[in-house]
Regions:
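N-terminal glycine-rich flavin-associated loop
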Residues: 1-23, 45-92, 104-137, 172-180
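Conserved glycine-rich FAD pyrophosphate-binding loop
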Residues: 4, 38, 91, 239-366
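A short linear hydrophobic-aromatic micro-motif
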Residues: 22, 84, 200-205, 285-288, ...
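Residue-level signal for inorganic ion chemistry
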Residues: 27, 216, 298
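Short glycine-biased active-site loop of nucleotidyltransferases that positions the nucleotide triphosphate
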Residues: 32-37
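Short, conserved charged micro-motifs
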Residues: 70-72, 185-190, 223-230, 277-284, ...
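C-terminal substrate-binding/cap subdomain adjacent to the FAD-binding core in PCMH-type
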Residues: 101, 120-263
Length: 366
């Protein structure tokens, strides 16, 4: 079946290349709302699925792009392993291809790294229907640029991802979540202070409801986690959450099902990537902070040019994440940053080397 599906995909891409058509790669559609508006004829990878190989001792798994993310995570859990960057699903049926194409990561990214850091190798189909392989199945030094790292966050605009090899990590021996009521500026300072010290700090979140609450997830050796929880309770008055409640909480942050995300879904949700030590921002709306201050979510009616200019002046960038009505002005682009203007030319040359006729030029990524 997979060989037939591969042939079908190859025929569709080759035909689109000949006819000058645009193809929009899709899996289960759980992230159709992400990025720019949908354009092009949908080409599903759902039938191209399956785990090709899994070597727990080598900490590597190779899967086809249409494979269910849930299926892969369950296979990893059986061996007490995980994707440490905690990819969000955003709905039932999320696929590995969508995970890679979106490049999104959950609370654990701040300590483990992003998805791109875990990609070892890929098999792709370019805009002419040719199959290409990059990278491998082990971490090693490579000569030149590791092309496989280009696929994460490319939103399907560079090539059709077929197979991907990913590094996995063992689950921690112990995990605990502590929390304390704290206003935003103090929370930002404390997150960065603790992150600079040898504590087993795995994730953090500040939820701006009422006076605000700071949540810290500790993960590592049992003795280290116990030492940290005791120290934080004594020094900062932090309380340890029930383990099941903590699991539900962090999943709600990862999947954006927490009440903060759904209570004001009539207004646009902005995502600001900033230096973690950036001071608290008064943007006139609601704020939720992750990644020790490096990722800030904001609900409110903001002027796109103003919020993007503010983020840039602080050394970061801003883009709308969810909104009922999106415009290109609301999305982050290389063109917004004068210092990276030269990269626009390089990016265009790179795209054309993989996709000369723009088969995958859907405009999802601007």
């Amino acid at each position: 079946m997979s060989e037939q599906t591969l042939n079908y995909l190859q025929e569709k891409v080759a035909h689109a290349n000949q006819q000058g058509q645009v193809i929009r790669i899709t899996g289960s559609g759980t992230k159709d709302w992400f990025g720019n508006k949908l354009q092009g004829e949908a080409l599903s990878t759902k039938e191209y699925s399956g785990i090709l190989s899994y070597q727990p001792d080598e900490l590597v798994i190779t899967v086809k792009s249409g494979t269910s993310l849930k299926e892969v995570e369950e296979a990893l859990a059986e061996k007490n392993q995980q994707f440490a960057f905690e990819p969000p699903h955003y709905g039932e049926g999320a696929t590995i291809g969508g995970m890679v194409a979106s490049g999104l990561a959950g609370p654990g990214r701040v300590s483990a790294g992003g998805l791109r850091d875990f990609v070892l190798g890929v098999k792709i189909m370019n805009g002419q229907g040719q199959i290409m392989n990059f990278g491998g199945t082990v971490m090693k030094n490579v000569a030149g640029y590791d092309v496989s790292r280009l696929l994460p966050s490319s939103m399907g605009t560079l090539a059709l991802l077929l197979d991907v090899s990913l590094k996995v990590l063992p689950k921690a021996a112990a995990t605990a979540t502590v929390s304390v009521a704290m206003e935003q500026s103090k929370a930002i300072h404390l997150m960065n202070l603790l992150a600079s010290q040898p504590w087993p700090l795995n994730a953090s979140a500040w939820v701006g409801e009422n006076a605000g609450t700071l949540y810290l997830r500790l993960s590592g050796a049992k003795a280290a986690v116990q030492s940290a929880t005791s120290a934080f309770a004594k020094t900062y008055g932090m309380q340890t959450m029930d383990a099941d409640e903590a699991t539900v909480f962090w999943k709600s942050i990862r999947e954006q099902t927490h009440s903060w995300f759904i209570s004001s879904d009539q207004t646009a949700l902005w995502r600001l990537a900033l230096p973690s030590t950036t001071a608290a921002l008064d943007l006139g709306g609601e704020t939720l902070i992750e990644w020790h201050g490096g990722q800030r979510w904001h609900r409110g009616s903001l002027d796109p040019k103003a919020i993007k200019a503010l983020a840039q002046s602080l050394g970061g960038h801003a883009s709308v994440f969810r909104a009922k009505e999106k415009s290109e002005q609301m999305l982050s682009s290389l063109k917004d940053h004068p210092l990276t203007a030269a990269l626009v030319v390089i990016e265009e040359r790179l795209r054309k080397s993989f996709d000369p006729k723009g088969v995958f030029a859907t405009g999802r990524l601007i």
